[in-house]
Amino acid sequence: MNNLLLNCDIGESFGAWRMGLDAEVMPLIDCANIACGFHAGDPGTMRRTVALAVEHGVRIGAHPGYPDLVGFGRRSLACSAQEVEDLLLYQIGALDGLCRAQGTRVRYVKPHGALYQDMMRDPAILAAVLRALAAYDRTLPLMLMSTRDNTAARALGEAHGIELWFEAFADRAYDGAGYLVSRSQPGAVHHDAETVLAQALLLARGAALRASDGSALALEAQTLCVHGDNPASLAAVRRIRDALEAA
């Protein structure tokens, strides 16, 4: 069984609004994708989430998104390549500053929501993200979605000198090309803990999933995305962690 790192989007509260069970999920994961204030999060939330990650020895990743608090970063914005670079540099730098104040640093980058999806489907946006990482710190890996064919993404990563960490999702359905089924479609998100655990174990074993079109889908992955938004999803994360450690 592959030794997949568990990553989770975290630090997504904002002001008086609370999102996720951060304190409960942090001890169960390897990598924390911390929101950087544009789609969610604020300076205080970011600083507290960094401290929580340090306490539990969890790697810290910047989780930048489009400037869209109302839409939680799930709506695409018509940004130029230069604007995408600027958005990435601003958000990575903000989180890294809060990290350095606590004796640590950002270790990787994973874009959020619509920016993540746009990056996966538009090579120009992916190239802009890679240029931002190269400009800020060429040693930072980029976490991105594993699909049926990672050849083009891998070539762009190599061209920019950026390491890629391919990820798969335990609680999402995939289409035939290996992309995530849109959240607007029925069955796009798995809510049943047994289904989430079964998919996580298939991915850890390198076995094929069943895509929404019925085809077999094999995904290359170094890390597995999980969510701890509610008690049910938290229970699924705990079961995945236990299963991976027992394997």
Swiss-Prot record:
Catalyzed reactions per annotation: 5-oxo-L-proline + ATP + 2 H2O = L-glutamate + ADP + phosphate + H(+)
Q: What is its EC number?
A: 3.5.2.9
Among InterPro entries, the record links this protein to:
Glyco_hydro/deAcase_b/a-brl, LamB/YcsF/PxpA-like
Disulphide-bridged cysteine pairs: none
Q: Which UniProt keywords apply?
A: ATP-binding, Hydrolase, Nucleotide-binding
| Domain of life, source organism | Bacteria
Gene Ontology terms for molecular function = 5-oxoprolinase (ATP-hydrolyzing) activity; ATP binding
Look at the named UniProt entry and state the broad enzyme category this protein falls under.
hydrolase
Q: Is-annotated flag, keyword Kinase? A: no
GO biological process assignments:
carbohydrate metabolic process
Q: What does this protein do?
A: Catalyzes the cleavage of 5-oxoproline to form L-glutamate coupled to the hydrolysis of ATP to ADP and inorganic phosphate.
Assembly description:
Forms a complex composed of PxpA, PxpB and PxpC.
Homology family: Belongs to the LamB/PxpA family.
Name assigned to this protein:
5-oxoprolinase subunit A 2
Record organism: Pseudomonas aeruginosa (strain ATCC 15692 / DSM 22644 / CIP 104116 / JCM 14847 / LMG 12228 / 1C / PRS 101 / PAO1)
